[in-house]
């Protein structure tokens, strides 16, 4: 996705505000720094507690929201279950924020970027990072958008200086994750990305780093052996099946545009294996394919499908996006995608279904033994194609099958331990659990007509060794599950 958006705002001075109180829960970084798991497929804290990345896309947060708005946005992200917000530090060179402050007042001489006595561009970014920490949210910090690198607005020497500036400013913040790239192929000025990434890593030894690629690419295509990359990211993008749009060079097979699960396998084909996630799937309420406002729009059920397909294929998390939120649309701000005058403001979009339904996926993944989970399509007999695909994953003593629109499935229960299994159906749109009963082993057929409601009626069949109690039989929602492991707080 390329962001080149019209901006019309009323400038206001920063005012004293009463920020919302911190949530009454432990700080995630009390578990130590984020690191890569021993099996190289997940993210975790130093004390062994799993970290399931659930990201929201807030690209233009630093540019378009004032202090009050930023606090409101981050508070609601936390309440909706998000633990990462992806932002652009620089969308342009220079970038202006809502207070009229610019990012590069003296070009790439960043010694003059933060003058005393001024609420500078960087002071406002500091505020956003600190408020995110207040809500236990990590900031996925895209240092500079790819279009600016492609246009030659920064060279390798400038990137090195910029990387040192960023690292020195944020290396001691607990809630930073560095993101190189920004909707760009890695072979476009790779010397700039190498210089920027290596400069940050030379100073900052506390935070993980990845790369956000162009649509239908994975960062592993260019950076699999880069010393600075800790985990991979792919952008499955915003196109429907068959929407090639005349591209002469196409990095995926025709008519596979929506199959975001395939990027996990293609990423892991590169060595060494690293964790991977979809950093930009189709956004809720954005025109299908982005650029034709007359197209239909991606719905809540679509964004759920992308999330479950990707995670059940082995992703270490998932990033959600919404057309209005990623642009931070509000009165006076023109949309870059859709029909101007008909788009909803970002703060209204936070009520949309898809935005509020991602937390059920996170809760489900943290309910089961985390690090033993693998994708395993052999669980299902005849797993279907396209929208009929049954996505399967399992641990040693549990298995899960996500169905987008299928009301029947044949499952091989011998793939997990236990002579008897307990079964549940989880509604992906509500997180509601229905206990289906206890049965034996072998290959079994499941008919879900009685528990599937609505259209498409997507959800997850859960089977657990009956000797385990990850979910109770009388449990009605996945949100009340107790995380399977609670390693000690390193500050205790």
Question: Which role does the model predict for each range below?
Answer:
Residues 205, 226-330:
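Catalytic-core region of carbohydrate-active enzymes that cleave or remodel glycosidic bonds
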Residues 25-243, 250-259:
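Active-site mouth of glycoside hydrolases
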Residues 178, 182, 279, 426:
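Active-site flanking residues adjacent to catalytic metal/cofactor-binding acidic residues
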Residues 24-28, 49, 272-276, 283-286, ...:
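Aromatic- and carboxylate-lined catalytic core of secreted/periplasmic carbohydrate-active enzymes
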Residues 18-21:
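Boundary at the C-terminal end of the N-terminal hydrophobic targeting segment
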Residues 444-446:
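Short strand-edge motifs at loop-to-beta-strand transitions and within beta-strands
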Residues 2-12:
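Bacterial N-terminal signal peptides
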